């Protein structure tokens, strides 16, 4: 069973990325996207982990013609991917990533982050470069679980390193580049190639929790100090469990622990929380307890504001990253004093409202995630639906009898085209000369118009 790991992290920053997007063969086009628009990952793994390095890429290889078709015959075609900035050498020199390499077997017993060939691998066995897997049901090629990580090396330009480190380390590039190429398997001929953004960023947990540790007497708190304070506070809830005393590997040093071990997180690819021996499993999901604590706990006293910069970006990657970066950010709704650009809460709902309605008890579900049809008409959303996590938009097909993924033309959630991040737009500009969603017919249809329009869904 495929694991799906992600976080709904919601980029107003043009990077200095140099991306090559071109078509190698006039008869084929390959269009690649990330599955979420942003993946969160922890900056250290010695004490606890919310999310490990885990990224997913999708691509559709389209054979052009009067009636173009996506092709997924693995015996005839090969589609490869390469995370350009992440190399074995750069990750070996990255102390945060090496913390993952050391602690991953403790967090996920039976898993080795180093494959038999000596290369780094993700939880599903996917590496930083390799072949994508054809999916005939989804009419796409996919690689799940790539261990992509924000880059601090010289593989990224200074302009790309827009993400600051709450622990004081060097800036990092949260918008990596994936090079995707399609080949004729028999002849090795290059049929098409493109590039797309692979996002991976740190959340805002440390920036706040180090200050919490200071308020409990730690003058210059470390992540371990912060973990100890969180454990003490966790013991004050109804579970009475001090998570900072759990020692899963019995080496005499508490941690590392995984939050979803006791609080179910479907994004980890699990249907039940595995639990720790001697400790009860919670009835509440990880999404529920995390958001409910920060929204309602009398100690935290968080005052929520619908403006993402004052609310969501305190936890989800904000500051220089601003991971909600698509065309909706420049669309205005409301009138008068209530007029504003579209915020997270306009699609997802106010956090307190979501908690009250029990949405966090069904995280990542198409029953609780936003739907395009709430505001837009004739979306085709739900057509050719292949199910799975992360909602109807990501897993639906439209256009030409439900052959094309919505994201192939429109981009991934939170980075819909045109995006405010220049790198997100490079692929569409190369394909049709515009950053807009794919709308020039002869991109795929031979003999059709080269003018921009709105294709039927």
Task: Please give the residue ranges for each predicted region.
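Bacterial N-terminal signal peptides that target proteins for export
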Residues: 1-9
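C-terminal segment of classical bacterial N-terminal signal peptides
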Residues: 15-23, 411
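Short S/T/G/P-enriched beta-strand
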Residues: 25-57, 62-78, 82-88, 188-249, ...
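Contiguous segments within soluble domain cores/interaction surfaces
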Residues: 28-165, 175, 200-202
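Short, solvent-exposed linear motifs at loop/edge-of-secondary-structure regions
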Residues: 34-74, 169-186, 285-298, 402-417, ...
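Extracellular structured ligand-interaction cores
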Residues: 54-56, 76, 172-179, 200-205, ...
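Ser/Thr/Pro-rich, low-complexity mucin-like regions
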Residues: 151-201, 212, 265-268
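Inter-heme linker and motif-flanking segments adjacent to c-type heme-binding CXXCH motifs
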Residues: 186-192, 213-249, 266-457
């Amino acid at each position: 069973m495929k694991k799906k790991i992600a976080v709904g992290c919601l980029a107003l920053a043009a990077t200095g990325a140099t991306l090559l997007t071109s078509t190698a063969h006039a008869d084929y086009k390959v269009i690649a996207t990330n599955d979420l628009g942003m993946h969160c990952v922890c900056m250290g793994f010695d004490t606890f982990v919310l999310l490990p390095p885990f990224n997913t890429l999708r691509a559709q290889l389209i054979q052009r013609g009067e009636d173009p078709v996506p092709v997924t015959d693995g015996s005839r075609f090969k589609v490869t991917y390469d995370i350009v900035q992440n190399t074995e050498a750069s990750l070996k020199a990255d102390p945060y990533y090496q913390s993952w390499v050391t602690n991953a077997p403790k967090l996920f017993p039976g898993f080795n982050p180093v494959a038999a060939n000596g290369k780094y691998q993700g939880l599903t066995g996917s590496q930083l470069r390799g072949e994508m897997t054809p999916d005939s049901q989804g009419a796409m090629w996919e690689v799940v679980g790539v261990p992509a990580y924000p880059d601090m090396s010289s593989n990224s330009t200074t302009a790309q390193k827009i993400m600051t480190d709450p622990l004081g380390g060097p800036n990092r590039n949260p918008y990596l580049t994936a090079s995707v190429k399609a080949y004729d398997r028999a002849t090795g001929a290059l049929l098409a190639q493109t590039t797309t953004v692979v996002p991976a960023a740190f959340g805002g947990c440390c920036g706040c929790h180090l200050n919490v540790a200071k308020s409990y007497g730690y003058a210059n708190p470390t992540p371990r100090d912060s973990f100890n304070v969180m454990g003490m506070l966790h013991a004050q809830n109804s579970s009475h469990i001090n998570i900072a005393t759990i020692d899963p590997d019995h080496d005499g040093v508490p941690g590392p622990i995984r939050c979803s071990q006791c609080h179910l997180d479907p994004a980890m690819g699990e249907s039940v929380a595995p639990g720790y021996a001697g400790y009860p499993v919670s009835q509440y999901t990880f999404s529920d307890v995390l958001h409910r604590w920060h929204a309602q706990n009398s100690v935290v006293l968080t005052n929520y504001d619908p403006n993402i910069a004052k609310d969501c970006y305190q936890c989800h990657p904000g500051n220089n990253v601003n991971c909600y970066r698509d065309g909706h950010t420049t669309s205005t709704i409301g009138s008068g004093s209530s007029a504003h650009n579209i915020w997270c809460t306009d699609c997802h709902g106010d956090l307190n409202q979501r908690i009250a309605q029990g949405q966090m008890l069904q995280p990542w579900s198409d029953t609780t995630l936003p739907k395009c049809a709430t505001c837009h008409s004739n979306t085709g959303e739900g057509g050719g639906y292949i199910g799975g996590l992360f909602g109807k938009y990501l897993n639906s097909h439209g256009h030409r009898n439900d052959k094309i993924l919505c994201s192939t033309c429109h981009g991934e959630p939170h980075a819909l085209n045109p995006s405010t991040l220049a790198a997100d737009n490079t692929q569409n500009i190369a394909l049709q000369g515009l950053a807009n969603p794919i709308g020039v017919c002869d991109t795929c249809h031979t003999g059709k118009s080269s003018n921009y329009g709105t294709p039927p869904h």
